[in-house]
Amino acid sequence: MSFEGTIMSEYEVSLKDIRKTFGFVPGFMKPVPKDVLVKQWPLLKKYQMGESIIPQKYRELIGLAVAATLKCPYCTLMHTAMAKGYGATDEEISEAGYLTAQTANWSSMLHANRYDYPTFAKEVDMVGENAKKKAGKK
């Protein structure tokens, strides 16, 4: 079988799996080069929709935070819909947005004040140790 034939058959298998996963092949996947889709689909499926250490709802809330930071309307829409689909409430989505804003806010403050990074790293270690104590971990 030729390289082109192998890619086509792998591509057809990928499309079939995408249909099974989503119920259809989303239009945004159609312009993706066939050889790229064959390689990217298993990774997308595993880490975005499969079993993982991080529960699905929280992965989607993380994705939403990243999308909001990137100001990507496509990703924001997708991760909001997926988070809600996995049980996220409007309040959780709002809180994810707030946490995203807080990270950007404090990052701006630290950069604007040119806060000493080694000092910050030591302080963060102390904050982490304090959090462990409060959580009852050693």
Which residues make up each language-model segment?
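Acidic, glycine/proline-rich low-complexity segments that act as flexible tails and inter-domain linkers
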Residues: M1-Y58, A112-K138
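Iron-sulfur (Fe-S) cluster-binding segments and ferredoxin-like electron-carrier domains
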Residues: L37-V38, M78-E92
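Amphipathic alpha-helical segments within well-ordered protein domains
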Residues: K45, G63, T80-K84
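Short, thiol/selenol-centered motifs that function as redox-active sites or metal-ligating centers
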Residues: I62, V66-M78
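Charged/polar positions within long, soluble alpha-helices
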Residues: Y74-L77, A81, N105-S108
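Beta-strand segments within the central parallel beta-sheet cores of soluble alpha/beta enzyme folds
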Residues: E92-Y98
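Short Fe-S-cluster ligation motifs
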Residues: Y98-D116
